[in-house]
Swiss-Prot record:
Pfam families: RGI1. It is a peripheral membrane protein. Coiled coil: none annotated. GO terms for biological process: energy reserve metabolic process. The lineage of its organism: Eukaryota, Fungi, Dikarya, Ascomycota, Saccharomycotina. Belongs to the RGI1 family. Disulfide bonds: none annotated. It is found in: Cell membrane. InterPro entries: RGI1, RGI1_sf. One of its GO terms (cellular component) is plasma membrane. This is Respiratory growth induced protein 1.
Length: 163
């Protein structure tokens, strides 16, 4: 038996604009990557994407994605309620811990709903190791699947040039 690679597993995807985005399929790998980037002082230039089944969905299906109910999607009030609780109480909290900013508040929040999907957006400006940066987290669920898309983006704040 061979040793497993301990690093987070991801795929590099190049966008139309030429940006390379790391795409994860496992929540733990995603959180480990964010933690490692913070420790490597790369926390203000990160863009990655996570596509995963939320833990409450996997729990209901006894950890078998094949047994996930078709009703687990953005049209189900129960699914949306549980997903929002998961985002607020677990996902955002875990991200704050991984980037070593437990007091981050995500004051700028928004929710967009359409027939096809529901999108929650969380934005804030913060500072770590003397560097100011913006953090943007977008969570999206769709009407045809229980898979949730999370887009995580951090970018440095550009100082305003005084005239």
């Amino acid at each position: 038996m061979t040793k497993k690679d301990k690093g987070p597993k991801f795929a590099n995807v190049t966008t139309k604009s030429g940006e390379v985005v790391k795409v994860f399929e496992d929540l733990n790998d995603f959180e480990t990557f964010i933690k490692n980037e913070t420790e490597d002082e790369e926390f203000d230039h990160v863009h990655c994407h996570l596509k995963y089944y939320p833990p409450f969905v996997l729990h209901e299906s006894h950890e078998d994605p094949e047994k996930i109910k078709d009703s687990a999607n953005s049209h189900s009030k129960k699914f949306v309620r549980h997903l929002h609780q998961h985002i607020e109480k677990h996902l955002l909290k875990d991200i704050k811990e991984r980037i070593k900013l437990p007091d981050l508040k995500f004051k700028d929040k928004a929710k967009e709903e359409s027939f096809e999907h529901i999108v929650w957006k969380y934005n804030d400006v913060t500072q770590y190791h003397g560097k100011d940066f913006e953090i943007h987290i977008t969570v999206e669920c769709h009407n045809d699947s229980a898979i949730v898309d999370v887009d995580y983006l951090t970018k440095p704040l550009t100082a305003a040039v005084e005239a």
